[in-house]
Swiss-Prot record:
It is a peripheral membrane protein. GO terms for cellular component: clathrin-coated vesicle membrane; cytosol; endosome membrane; extracellular exosome; Golgi membrane; lysosomal membrane; membrane; plasma membrane. V-ATPase is a heteromultimeric enzyme made up of two complexes: the ATP-hydrolytic V1 complex and the proton translocation V0 complex. The V1 complex consists of three catalytic AB heterodimers that form a heterohexamer, three peripheral stalks each consisting of EG heterodimers, one central rotor including subunits D and F, and the regulatory subunits C and H. The proton translocation complex V0 consists of the proton transport subunit a, a ring of proteolipid subunits c9c'', rotary subunit d, subunits e and f, and the accessory subunits ATP6AP1/Ac45 and ATP6AP2/PRR. InterPro entries: ATPase_V1-cplx_f_g_su, ATPase_V1-cplx_fsu_euk, ATPase_V1_fsu_sf. SUPFAM superfamilies: AtpF-like. GO terms for biological process: endosomal lumen acidification; Golgi lumen acidification; intracellular pH reduction; lysosomal lumen acidification; proton transmembrane transport; synaptic vesicle lumen acidification; vacuolar acidification. Belongs to the V-ATPase F subunit family. The lineage of its organism: Eukaryota, Metazoa, Chordata, Craniata, Vertebrata. This is V-type proton ATPase subunit F. Subunit of the V1 complex of vacuolar(H+)-ATPase (V-ATPase), a multisubunit enzyme composed of a peripheral complex (V1) that hydrolyzes ATP and a membrane integral complex (V0) that translocates protons. V-ATPase is responsible for acidifying and maintaining the pH of intracellular compartments and in some cell types, is targeted to the plasma membrane, where it is responsible for acidifying the extracellular environment. Its main location: membrane. The gene is ATP6V1F.
Length: 119
């Protein structure tokens, strides 16, 4: 019998999180903690950072999706995460397009390969 797979967690604006919840990613762990955070205008940076760190420490989460503009608010926490699991992916939001220049994970990945490696 195969083991249970890992979850996708989402930190984002209401539209982003709602879209993923409608897609079926919403879960509660055994302690009744959700795998998502809706960031609203009154959500503090500490709340975002605490939730991100909680997601990092959960063994049932394999991927964390975060709106890039929110990732900018807690960039130091994202940059400190060096492990491959959970993978952290920055995604665009309806109001904020994706900017590859701001994506620290993409910059790190680019540094791992040279042009020769890609031939």
């Amino acid at each position: 019998m195969a083991g249970r797979g890992k979850l996708i967690a989402v930190i984002g604006d209401e539209d982003t999180v709602t879209g993923f919840l409608l897609g079926g990613i919403g879960e509660l762990n055994k302690n009744r903690h959700p795998n998502f955070l809706v960031v609203e205008k009154d959500t503090t940076i500490n709340e975002i950072e605490d939730t991100f760190r909680q997601f990092l420490n959960r063994d049932d989460i394999g991927i964390i999706l975060i709106n890039q503009y929110i990732a900018e608010m807690v960039r130091h926490a994202l940059d400190a995460h060096q492990q491959s699991i959970p993978a952290v992916l920055e995604i665009p939001s309806k109001e904020h397009p994706y900017d590859a220049a701001k994506d620290s994970i993409l910059r790190r990945a680019r540094g791992m390969f040279t042009a020769e490696d890609l031939r």
